[in-house]
């Protein structure tokens, strides 16, 4: 029953998000005022093209994960916790949808925490499958709370300087306050706080455990949406709210954000190369890809912004595909490491094929969506004269090819180890 409610709610959310995309395409941005109080005093939802696409991404990922959970929950979660699981999942989905819809900076904090609270509980529920889910959930709780606190402190600085929490009104008032130390401190606190939520290096310690040990339903949904929503909010603040776009915080972006993003792209790719557990490998890969997106944003140009958002959407689809394929294989074949996945294509051809397609796109094989997104980032970097970013992207892409190649080699070309468990219950996932 709880699964049916979850699927029905997710179908409704996806349908509404699709309708919203159509309305925005026809009429431009949409503003909805709550309670009859006009902004900036009243609470407002404001949806533009990017917000509508993010809503569609979140709702679609939620629908796919909800449908998928019909087979995975019985194996990964105790029966008495199924209702709790689906309730938390819908709460998390609602919070993220509110986050990309609101036009109020404080309500963005509220929605961010609504989604996070649901996520903490959902990761912990995975302890039935792996006891490491409990410390992973606790680590996420601690880091998430620190990130939320930083965001709230930064928002307090901005409110003290502007006297408003409405994003559009705040942007208008900040134009004359660009030299304010209070505003600059608020900028730094907000970017760092959201960076923790987005798993920005070196504040990403919560992510590998959360992705690796959570139930498949949550791994799929988190991989597609959680860090992406925080990155979306960073982009909103950097390009839409602070004066003169990203040029306002250019010193912070140039000397802090961009170097950390470059380090993440390379260091976390190296960690993925040497990781043995498949889910943790994909988790480190996600941190590296966050670095790719932040490098695009750090260019402080419209081309960099569009390239970063394209890469964000592409990566969400790729990671959702990869975690669904890994989850399907793990349910039937009971594996964790690359050695245990060896030769799996013979027993599970369809899931292996999906895994191969997702891996190829993640590596940036030509004609895939991953290649197109990386190419757009490279073009933006060259247009901005930032050749060093192109070099970083090239090195990180080669490292991506290495760890993706390990997965493909194990799945398609390596012989299965003697006595390895193979398809259970007669299924061919």
Describe the predicted segments one by one.
Residues 414-429:
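Interfacial loop-to-transmembrane junctions
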Residues 64-74, 89, 93-108, 120-375, ...:
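Hydrophobic transmembrane alpha-helices and their helix-loop junctions in integral membrane proteins
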Residues 113:
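Short phosphate-coordinating micro-motif centered on Lys-Gly-acidic
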Residues 2, 353-354, 419-420:
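Acidic/polar loop patches that form or flank catalytic/metal-binding clefts of enzymes
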Residues 1-87, 168-172:
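Transmembrane helix-loop-helix hairpins at membrane boundaries of multipass inner-membrane proteins
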